[in-house]
């Protein structure tokens, strides 16, 4: 026996929960979904079944009404003739054998008259009541009688009144005492959920069926001890619907109908109507809708980028995706966001939005129809002038926006080649193929980039409509020294600020930044021109006002960034600051060379030797007028140099060096690096171009060129004494000779 059922060759029903438990499926099955299974254990007492009557409903269907009594509880059950026949077969298939139960088979008798069939059922239920007990474990048999495995009342979920959805809610306004078991006891203040509402009749009292949802007295089920729910009928005049529109008005006044303004209603409706987005829309359709040849988004984005987008990496760096989506939503809804104000915070999002618009065009700017002719024209072996003439007939309109940005490549680091690489996938796309293959998309990337680069470089010749250069906000900085409008870049705004900070913060970098306006008042030629008297070994190019302001502010920002770092970095920075300041003083001597240090202790380390070495190692500083210096050692001529400028030279003499350079009794002079320093600081050296916008932090202890180098790298090639310059030195007067060399060494040199 397995679960009270004899073993048989027939497999378990797939609807049985035991079959599903032994199978692969572990999904929990509802009891209602299981058609046939047997309980493992059943606790049933005597069950009594009594036939009450056979009634006919409105549909002329017979319903056999019976009462089931179990565990001192009773309930009514209605079944049809077919249900009784199925129950009889299931009972004798799983529980009893007919020869032992001695019950009549009901299936052949379902066609009898109602009276005769009722007599058969009365005898059947009397015999069944004698056989019931814990032997019945079949779920379909117990379900027919609405009995659970413990003998309680079991009602399937689909037949339970508590699960019937409510159609209205009402509050009780009058107490009601039930006169039948099917009626519901009500108290004032209770809330019921109505499940059945019958139509009102003029002469009879109307009853509704409802579930008692909220009651003043808790109802406890005596069977399981849990909170129970009451379901029953009650008179409709005892409750008032919560959403009843016929509630009495305390003011006894009817609300006035709100006037409807048709014009305002239509305006609001059309204003709130969802607009068709402009992204992904054909340019021809957009022109028919707005009547503008150039879309508004292109005009606004180009104006904002030309005004505030002259920054490094424009169109190459991507903006913040959330900002891009926000701007796109505003343009799609028909609004025009303020890109001028938005560009001050994130100009890269504006450039990314413009690229996204061209990339999502169904037909690109260079259309599929013109694509074959464009490729064929560009790939012809012609000169630049001939290609310009050929392409001019193909291109009707193209924004000169990229060409203007190309002129500012020193500020944006975006040449025509870089702009072409970024923009060619957005402007050129080959026509789609019939088979839908995408392999052809990569075949023309180089050609697309070359065409875009050619159009940017030759935009002035390709397009007939010339734009007034005075109206352009971007100017060329390659051919002449020009300035951008003051509102163009943030560097210009910062250069005009005139804050007075304490002298403590004014290092070399900050001092140059604060004196920038005074430099502009000087002659433009001093900054822009390239006089022949300037240093020849440094190539430089003219720059714009914005470039100089950027370089000056970057040096100031680097100093302020150091002031905001941690204490450890501040200590390290001050240590380097003091070391550099000491090393750059004109009167500071360089550290002794390793050869000098070896010579000090090579002879025993005596005091006399040390004193002798120190005497020979001393530095001789000679100050001569500039005219004398030019006659002896020829530095670069400077037209603006003052006559009071002095030249400082340091020459160290070492005995160990004498032997290495002595040849045929003639002392050779070793090559020395010298540094020339102007006594006056009126001349301001120009700012030179750098490969990086951020220079190394400079100190305030020296006055040198802004390009950071070591202290001996600023020397003119003609300012060093080489072997070829021994003859001009020998032609000096004896006084000048003694100024440069010691007397003993000078006598040996000139006597030779």
UniProtKB/Swiss-Prot annotation:
It holds the Pfam family SH3_2. Residues 281-463 form the Rho-GAP domain. The record marks 316 as: Arginine finger. One of its GO terms (molecular function) is GTPase activator activity. Signal peptide: none annotated. The keyword Zinc-finger does not apply. This is GTPase-activating protein rrc-1. The lineage of its organism: Eukaryota, Metazoa, Ecdysozoa, Nematoda, Chromadorea. The gene is rrc-1.
């Amino acid at each position: 026996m397995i679960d009270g059922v004899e073993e048989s060759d027939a497999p378990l029903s797939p609807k049985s929960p035991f079959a599903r438990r032994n199978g692969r499926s572990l999904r929990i099955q509802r009891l209602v979904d299981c058609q046939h299974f047997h309980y493992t254990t059943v606790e049933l007492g005597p069950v009594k079944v009594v036939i009450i009557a056979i009634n006919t409903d409105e549909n002329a269907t017979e319903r056999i009404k019976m009462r089931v009594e179990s565990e001192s509880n009773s309930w009514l059950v209605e079944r049809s003739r077919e249900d009784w026949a199925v129950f009889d077969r299931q009972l004798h298939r799983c529980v009893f054998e007919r020869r032992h139960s001695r019950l009549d088979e009901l299936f052949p008798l379902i066609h009898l008259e109602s009276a005769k069939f009722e007599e058969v059922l009365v005898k059947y239920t009397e015999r069944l009541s004698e056989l019931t007990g814990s032997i019945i474990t079949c779920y379909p048999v117990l379900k027919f009688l609405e009995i659970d495995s413990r003998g309680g009342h079991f009602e399937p979920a689909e037949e339970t009144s508590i699960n019937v959805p409510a159609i209205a809610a009402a509050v009780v306004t009058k107490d009601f005492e039930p006169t039948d078991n099917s009626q519901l006891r009500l108290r004032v203040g209770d809330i019921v959920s109505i499940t059945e509402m019958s139509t009102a009749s003029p002469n009879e009292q109307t009853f509704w069926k409802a579930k008692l949802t909220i009651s003043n007295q808790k109802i406890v089920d005596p069977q399981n001890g849990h909170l129970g729910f009451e379901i029953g009928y009650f008179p409709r005049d005892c409750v008032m619907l919560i959403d009843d529109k016929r509630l009495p008005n305390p003011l006894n006044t009817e609300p006035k109908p709100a006037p409807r303004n048709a014009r305002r209603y239509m305006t609001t409706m059309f204003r709130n109507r969802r607009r068709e987005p402009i992204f992904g829309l054909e340019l021809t359709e957009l022109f028919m809708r707005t009547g503008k040849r150039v879309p508004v988004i292109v005009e606004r984005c180009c104006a904002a980028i030309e005004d505030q987008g002259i920054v490094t990496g424009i169109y190459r760096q991507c903006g913040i995706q959330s900002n891009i989506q926000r701007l796109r939503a505003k343009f799609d809804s028909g609004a025009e966001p303020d890109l001028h104000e938005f560009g001050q915070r994130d100009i890269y999002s504006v450039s990314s939005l413009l690229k996204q618009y061209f990339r999502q065009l169904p037909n690109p700017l260079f259309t599929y129809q013109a694509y074959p002719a464009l490729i064929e024209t560009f790939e012809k072996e012609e000169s630049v002038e001939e290609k310009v003439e050929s392409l001019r007939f193909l291109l009707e309109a193209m924004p000169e926006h990229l060409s203007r940005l190309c002129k500012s490549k020193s500020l944006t680091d975006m040449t025509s080649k870089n702009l072409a690489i970024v923009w060619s996938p957005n402007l050129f796309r080959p026509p789609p193929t019939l088979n839908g293959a995408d392999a052809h998309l990569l075949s023309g990337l180089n050609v697309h980039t070359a065409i875009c680069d050619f159009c940017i470089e030759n935009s002035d010749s390709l397009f007939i409509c010339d734009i007034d250069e005075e109206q352009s906000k971007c100017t060329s900085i390659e051919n002449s020294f020009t300035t951008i409008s003051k509102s163009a870049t943030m560097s210009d705004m910062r250069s005009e600020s005139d804050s007075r900070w304490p002298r403590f913060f004014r290092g070399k970098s900050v001092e140059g930044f604060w004196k920038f306006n005074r430099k502009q008042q000087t002659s433009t030629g001093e900054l822009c021109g390239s006089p022949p008297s300037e240093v020849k070994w440094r190539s430089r190019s003219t720059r714009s006002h914005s470039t100089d302001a950027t370089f000056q502010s970057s040096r100031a920002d680097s100093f302020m960034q150091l002031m905001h770092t941690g204490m450890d970095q501040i200590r390290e920075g001050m240590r380097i600051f003091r070391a550099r300041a000491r090393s750059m003083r004109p009167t500071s001597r360089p550290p002794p060379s390793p050869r000098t240090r070896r010579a000090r202790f090579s002879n025993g380390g005596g005091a006399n030797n040390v004193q002798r070495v120190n005497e020979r190692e001393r530095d001789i500083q000679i100050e001569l007028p500039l005219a004398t210096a030019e006659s002896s050692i020829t530095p670069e001529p400077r037209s603006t140099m003052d006559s009071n400028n002095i030249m400082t030279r340091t020459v160290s003499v070492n005995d160990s060096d004498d032997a290495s350079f002595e040849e045929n009794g003639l002392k050779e002079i070793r090559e020395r690096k010298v540094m020339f320093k102007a006594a006056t600081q009126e001349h301001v050296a120009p700012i030179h171009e750098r490969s990086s916008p951020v220079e190394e932090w400079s100190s305030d202890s020296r006055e040198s060129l802004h390009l950071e180098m070591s202290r001996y790298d600023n020397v003119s090639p003609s300012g060093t004494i080489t072997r070829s310059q021994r003859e001009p030195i020998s032609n000096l007067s004896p006084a000048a000779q003694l100024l440069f060399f010691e007397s003993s060494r000078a006598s040996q040199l000139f006597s030779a």
